Swiss-Prot record:
Signal peptide: 1-32
Descriptive protein name: B-cell antigen receptor complex-associated protein alpha chain
Source organism of this protein record: Homo sapiens
TM segment ranges: 144-165
A Gene Ontology cellular-component term: multivesicular body
Keywords in alphabetical order: Adaptive immunity, Cell membrane, Disulfide bond, Glycoprotein, Immunity, Immunoglobulin domain, Membrane, Methylation, Phosphoprotein, Receptor, Signal, Transmembrane, Transmembrane helix
Main localization category: membrane
Domain Ig-like C2-type: from-to ranges: 33-116
Length: 226
């Protein structure tokens, strides 16, 4: 078959060249309109701003509009909110409250063609988290805890040390007093017991130790004084 192999080799190059020329001459205006994925839900706190985006592959001439499906009324027609602001069709809701809850849907349309619609983003409005009584950073909290530990250690060590020194001083003082009492008790250590008994006999005099009170009248009884 004349010219068969050469024709087969030139066929892939021709197809690639035609595809490249069609992509260059047609440009983005002849491409199909499609949209990027959007987040399924968006959570904001009460009083904050909510930002919705509608990314798509269309040119700047595309018309982006936003619609809201009311919460609990999905069978009703969606509520028109207005056009998007930038090329991504961003919708900003300021100072969000509970009434802004619902599903937000964006529509992109080029000219008279049919529009493309996103799957929708559900807006959830929550109460702001309670602020702590002492709104401090982690570094400040760590420094406060360190200072508290030092103060507790000081309060535990200093009184205990003072009590130990006081107890030691009392023990030393009691030791000295006990030594003085021991010396006072030994003042008469060198006296003779016979001298002590002689002194006792002299103090008693010639009176007997016992009296015969049976032969005396009651008025004449004289008892020995100790």
């Amino acid at each position: 078959m004349p010219g068969g192999p050469g024709v087969l080799q030139a066929l892939p190059a021709t197809i690639f060249l035609l595809f490249l020329l069609s992509a260059v001459y047609l440009g983005p205006g002849c491409q199909a309109l499609w949209m990027h994925k959007v987040p399924a839900s968006l959570m904001v706190s009460l009083g904050e701003d909510a930002h919705f985006q509608c990314p798509h592959n269309s040119s700047n001439n595309a018309n982006v509009t936003w619609w809201r499906v009311l919460h609990g009324n999905y069978t009703w027609p969606p509520e028109f909110l207005g056009p998007g602001e930038d090329p991504n069709g961003t919708l900003i809701i300021q100072n969000v409250n509970k009434s802004h809850g619902g599903i937000y849907v964006c529509r992109v349309q080029e000219g008279n063609e049919s529009y493309q619609q996103s799957c929708g983003t559900y807006l959830r409005v929550r109460q702001p988290p309670p602020r702590p009584f002492l709104d401090m950073g982690e570094g400040t909290k760590n420094r406060i805890i360190t200072a508290e530990g030092i103060i507790l250690l000081f309060c535990a060590v200093v009184p205990g040390t003072l009590l130990l020194f006081r107890k030691r001083w009392q023990n030393e003082k009691l030791g000295l007093d006990a030594g003085d009492e021991y010396e006072d008790e030994n003042l008469y250590e060198g006296l003779n017991l016979d001298d002590c008994s002689m002194y006792e006999d002299i103090s008693r005099g010639l009176q007997g130790t016992y009296q015969d009170v049976g032969s005396l009248n009651i008025g004449d009884v004289q008892l020995e004084k100790p």
